From Swiss-Prot:
Cleaves peptides in various proteins in a process that requires ATP hydrolysis. Has a chymotrypsin-like activity. Plays a major role in the degradation of misfolded proteins. The keyword Protease applies. Its EC number is 3.4.21.92. GO terms for cellular component: cytoplasm; endopeptidase Clp complex. This is ATP-dependent Clp protease proteolytic subunit.
């Protein structure tokens, strides 16, 4: 999560000991809300992982709310978030606002079953993993990377099939090309459990 300081509002709280200033994201962290905004990178993933571990240490029995607005990004960085979501004790509820594409969609689907949400105008996109940055070098090296990419593709498809309650063949077919979905379509597919029109519609 990377925000320019001049764009981040500061919240002033009054207490018996005077005023205390928080940036808005630190204030929301107190409410157990974690954001993934923008591409999934090593830096953004490390911030999310650190916040998840911190919130577990604060209260291992209280849900964490993971808000996602991401076009996707690094598979290895995303898997560090995924593994941490499963490693910690609290349930992690996921919510898509804006978009959850590629690794963003994978993380959205990985929330606690029954606690995966999207706002009405969200867009979700699934596809097969990509090689980023262009791949060059010897033919044998390219072959090694191609085999690794196929292994990653199979693993992601198997995991997402489990989270969506679908057959592996469905994921292999439906991720072959960019596959865009509305919130309604994502719910039907099994990527989310509920569409939230407003806070009052939150049920779990």
């Amino acid at each position: 999560m990377s925000f320019d300081n001049y764009l981040v509002p500061t919240v002033i709280e009054q207490s018996g000991r005077g005023e205390r200033a928080f940036d808005i994201y630190s204030r929301l962290l107190k409410e157990r809300i974690v954001f993934l905004v923008g591409p999934v990178t090593d830096e953004s993933a490390n911030l999310v992982v650190a916040q998840l571990l911190f919130l577990e240490s604060e209260n291992p029995d209280k849900d964490i709310f993971f808000y996602i607005n991401s076009p996707g990004g690094s598979v290895t960085a995303g898997m560090s978030i995924y593994d941490t979501m499963n490693f910690i004790k609290p349930d992690v509820s996921t919510l898509c606002l804006g978009q959850a594409a590629s690794m963003g969609a994978f993380l959205l689907s990985a929330g606690e079953k029954g606690k995966r949400f999207a706002l009405p105008n969200s867009r979700i996109m699934i596809h097969q993993p990509l090689i980023s940055g262009g791949l060059g070098g010897q033919a044998s090296d390219i072959e090694i990377h191609a085999r690794e990419l196929l292994k990653i593709k199979e693993k992601l498809n198997r995991l997402m099939a489990k989270h969506c309650g679908r057959d592996l063949a469905d994921l292999e077919r439906d991720t072959d090309r960019d596959n865009f979905m509305s919130a309604e379509e994502a719910k039907e597919y099994g990527l989310i459990d509920q569409i939230l029109e407003n806070r009052a519609s939150l049920q779990f």
